[in-house]
Every structure is written in structure tokens, then in C-alpha cells.
């Protein structure tokens, strides 16, 4: 395994909320390699205990070092890498706007063989910028790794395992038995301090174009024979995906969230530019032009400030049976069979867990030098192609902006 993690942006929100807790969980579970080191780096200075305070109590002090860096200066980054042995995993916990400068600086360092440069979504803002990011990674001298943390969720990994290990499920996993597949990413919270990013992205770019298309790929793909074939099968789905229509978009108006808090109209939220016409709700229908799924409809729906938190994959079978696979709240697998009386028999299986958060699984994949939980370069590009017709229609103003009250079920 890679013995050193260089964490750029170590003082930021991503590191504090997700990466350090994930590293702590891996250390407590004895899943990190012997002699493992975390080199934190950011622009500001920290005192001797500064990184330890950020990292929390689950990581020992002798595992942590800190270097102030200038991302545009290769010699500054070289000082952070100096003294490490073997390959390094460089995690860019940074705003996407500085990815290019940082990768170019890293390319000048001549990192050890088998080193990796890790970037978070969004992978560009359209097809061309995604391709440009891929080109930078390809010429960096290190292996590029694209993180979509949803792939690290146990529930998502279980989806593929269920198909592989339960032949009865795989037998009805096609358009001959399934009428419709719904992929839902419904959140009860509003902006929660993310207006600076979200107002420039919107629901479609924030989650539907990445998290939800990855789920679509895992649902629609032919089962890979091994991990090496996984990205090929996912890419085949994205190549076969076609939007049906130009979708729906909406934004919330003043209302009461599920937790009781009152929120104003989205356009009046702090940090929001009302002239951007940013959607907080996105709905897109797709079809897969593949042998197994021709004729079935896929509906993807994402929204903020809704009545219920639901992140699910739902298969609606032609015989009235419904299979609900929880992704992140609820996380159970639920099978519903409609009865003649109008009632339904419901069978519920709780999700097994190894106790590790999604980012812990992602970090293990990074450090092991594998790519099972990554987004492939062509996948990142093709995902933008899938949603391009919808984005073009929305930017042209041909799709109306609907409204829904915060805390409601969404637009009618």
C-alpha cells in the first residue's frame, strides 16, 4: 500500500469533516499500512499541535506532519514531499478552481512511481473542461484518481454484490421484467452554508450529473466478470444513455423545513444571486439503448428542502412488485408485493456494515493502488455528454422554472 498521504487543503472543510475522521476510523480498525504518514498542507501556518487538533484524537501525533505550501510553487510542494519514501497519494481537498495549477506544480516534482493524484467531483463544468482535467492528470507523471464518495458507501457496493450473489434478483434485472427505475436523491436540508458553490452549480450539476449517473451505471450495466472490467461496463451504460425530453427544474420558496426551521425563498437566501436562475430541484428521464434495458424508463430526481430524506434506487416491476434499495437514509433493502386487497406485503432487510464511513473505503482504494471505487476518465467526460441536452435547454430558457414550498414533496 502507498505509505504516505499528502493532504492538500488540510485545514479545509472536506478534510475536517470527512477525510480526517475516515483516516481515524482506518487507524482504529488497524487498516493503515505500517509506518503510514499523513502530511497535511495548506496556505496558512499552524503551530506544533495545530494539525493534531484538526485531525482529532483517533490519529497518533507521530503520524502527522504539517507544511505551509504555495500551490503554484513546485518547490513549496517539493518541501512537503521531501523525506517521504516510496509512492505518495496526493489528495486535492481543494476548490476545483485550483486543480489545474496544483496538478501542473505536482507534475514538476517527478513523484515516485505508483504515486497518485486524487481529485474530488465536480470533474470540470462540461465535457471540454472534464477532458482538459483528464489531460492534466494524464501528463502529471502520477496515476489520476477521481473520487465520487457515493461509490464508497457500503449500500452502493452492496447493490452490485446483491446482483452478483442473488441469481433470482439478476433474472428480473432487465426491461423484460422492470417497467421503470427511479433514482432519488431527495434532501430535507437547504443550503447549509454552501450557497457559494451550490448557486453556481444547481441540483443537476451538484448531484444528478455525478452521484446519480454513477448509480445509473451500476444499475444498468452488465455484471463485470472482475474488477478490471467494471469501468468498461459502467462506461457502456453512459454511452447508451439518452435523455427523454428536457426534464423539469424548480426552486424552493419560503417554508418550513422538516426540522422545523423557517427558510426564505431560495432567491432571498444569503449568498444567492437570483439572476442565475439556479434550480434546487432537477428531474430528468432517460432511456438506455442497450439490449437489456430497451423500453424501460429511468427517472432521476434530486432536490433540496423537501419533505423527506430519500436516497434510493427503486425498481418497479411489471407485476406490481417494488424493490427499494436504500443508498443513504433509509439504507434498508425493501421488497413490496401488492395484494389483491390493495394492501402490500413488505419484506425489509437491514444493511450490513463494517462500521467504516464511505471516505474510509475510498481512501483504502486509493492507498491500495486499485480503482474499484473511482470514476474512470471517460466516465467523467461521458457523464457531461448525457446531460448536455438538458443543460442547453435550461440555459436557453426553454424549460420553465417551477416552484415548490420548502418542506413540501416538491413541484406538483
Give residue ranges: language-model regions:
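Secretory/organelle targeting and membrane-embedding segments
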Residues: 1-118, 123-412
Amino acid at each position: 500500500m502507498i505509505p504516505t498521504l499528502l493532504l492538500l487543503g488540510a485545514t479545509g472543510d472536506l478534510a475536517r469533516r470527512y477525510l480526517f475522521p475516515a483516516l481515524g476510523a482506518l487507524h482504529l480498525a488497524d487498516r493503515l499500512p505500517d509506518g503510514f504518514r499523513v502530511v497535511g498542507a495548506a496556505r496558512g501556518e499552524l503551530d506544533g499541535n495545530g494539525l493534531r487538533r484538526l485531525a482529532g484524537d483517533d490519529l497518533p501525533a507521530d503520524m502527522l506532519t504539517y507544511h505551509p505550501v504555495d500551490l503554484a510553487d513546485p518547490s513549496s510542494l517539493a518541501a512537503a514531499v521531501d523525506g517521504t519514501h516510496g509512492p505518495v497519494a496526493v489528495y486535492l481537498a481543494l476548490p476545483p478552481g485550483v486543480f489545474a495549477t496544483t496538478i501542473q506544480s505536482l507534475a514538476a516534482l517527478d513523484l515516485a512511481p505508483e504515486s497518485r493524484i486524487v481529485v474530488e467531483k465536480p470533474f470540470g463544468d462540461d465535457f471540454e473542461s472534464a477532458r482538459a482535467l483528464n489531460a492534466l492528470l494524464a501528463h502529471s507523471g502520477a496515476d489520476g484518481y477521481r473520487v465520487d464518495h457515493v461509490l464508497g458507501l457500503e449500500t452502493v457496493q452492496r447493490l452490485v454484490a446483491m446482483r452478483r450473489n442473488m441469481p433470482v434478483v439478476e433474472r428480473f434485472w432487465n426491461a423484460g421484467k422492470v417497467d421503470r427505475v427511479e433514482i432519488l436523491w431527495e434532501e430535507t436540508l437547504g443550503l447549509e452554508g454552501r450557497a457559494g458553490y451550490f448557486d453556481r452549480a444547481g441540483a443537476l450539476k451538484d448531484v444528478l450529473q455525478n452521484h446519480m449517473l454513477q448509480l445509473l451505471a451500476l444499475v444498468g450495466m452488465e455484471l463485470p466478470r472482475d474488477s478490471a472490467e467494471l469501468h468498461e461496463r459502467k462506461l457502456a451504460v453512459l454511452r447508451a444513455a439518452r435523455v427523454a425530453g428536457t426534464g423539469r427544474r424548480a426552486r424552493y420558496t419560503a417554508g418550513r423545513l422538516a426540522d422545523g426551521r423557517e427558510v426564505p425563498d431560495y432567491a432571498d437566501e444569503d449568498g444567492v444571486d437570483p439572476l442565475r436562475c439556479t434550480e434546487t430541484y432537477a428531474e430528468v428521464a432517460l432511456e438506455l439503448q442497450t439490449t437489456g434495458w430497451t423500453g424501460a424508463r429511468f427517472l432521476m430526481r434530486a432536490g433540496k428542502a423537501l419533505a423527506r430524506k430519500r436516497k434510493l434506487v427503486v425498481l418497479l416491476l411489471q407485476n406490481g412488485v417494488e424493490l427499494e434499495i436504500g443508498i443513504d437514509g433509509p439504507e434498508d433493502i425493501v421488497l413490496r408485493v401488492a395484494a389483491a386487497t390493495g394492501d402490500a406485503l413488505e419484506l425489509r432487510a437491514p444493511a450490513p456494515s463494517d462500521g467504516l464511513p464511505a471516505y474510509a473505503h475510498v481512501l483504502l482504494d486509493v492507498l491500495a493502488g486499485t480503482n474499484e471505487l473511482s470514476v474512470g476518465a471517460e466516465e467523467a467526460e461521458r457523464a457531461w455528454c448525457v446531460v448536455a441536452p438538458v443543460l442547453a435547454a435550461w440555459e436557453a430558457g426553454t424549460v420553465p422554472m417551477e416552484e415548490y414550498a420548502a418542506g413540501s414533496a416538491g413541484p406538483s
